[in-house]
Amino acid sequence: MTPEELLHAFARTRASLDGEETVFWWTGDVHSWAPGEPYRRLFGFEGLNAARLEADEEGGGYRMLSREAAFYLDPATREILETWQDKPVVHVWNDPANQRWRPFPVPRTELGDQVCFSLEIPLAYPSPLPVADYPLNSADDTYRALELFQFFTPAAALAGDAPSVPATMSWTRMSPWLPWMEQGQRPGGLTFHCRGVKLASYAEVPESTRAYIAARHPEFARAPEKWTEPNESSWTYFRRLNPR
């Protein structure tokens, strides 16, 4: 397959070619690691991404306009946390979380009657939270993380011509301690391990999660209507809440 064909297939799996909104919902856990310490399951994690595609005439691919919200949960009860070790929890409110896709050889693996698209995204860039300004909240002046995605779809669905195909996903993320955890430069960090599904509509998001979003940021039920920059992240959102 050409890079253009691979991107076309991936776009149908990740979103919808007709510009209709798609919602991915995921659930999982967040584990800590640190030298000399056992691995610990600190949080449950649940979230969603509402997205829509539009053609990127300039780049010859697509622009994905999206928002994503995600929540840290009590690992036992799976209730959304408001505090952790007497510190306020800052949940994920990334608006926007846009992507620009240009044709590239998207890794594709046939797994029986399924097709898997894999994305490995190493990140390293100047931290929005310099240690000098945020000594309790920042692990380093360089933000480093690793995002690992797998999107699965039935091969038979992909062989058709529908603009969107059913999909499930897995996501693993290795990152520094979260800013609100106030771990400073302590060695170690977090591993997120989640699985998810493309929903038929936002109405399929668990009711308690929809209620939480509706009471705080109802706009996260929909994808953005227009392209904006820059993207929001947990680090930039924390800086916005806590300017220095």
Residues of each region from the PLM?
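Intrinsic structural disorder/low-complexity segments
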Residues: S32-A34, G44, V90, P176, ...
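Long terminal segments
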Residues: P107-R244
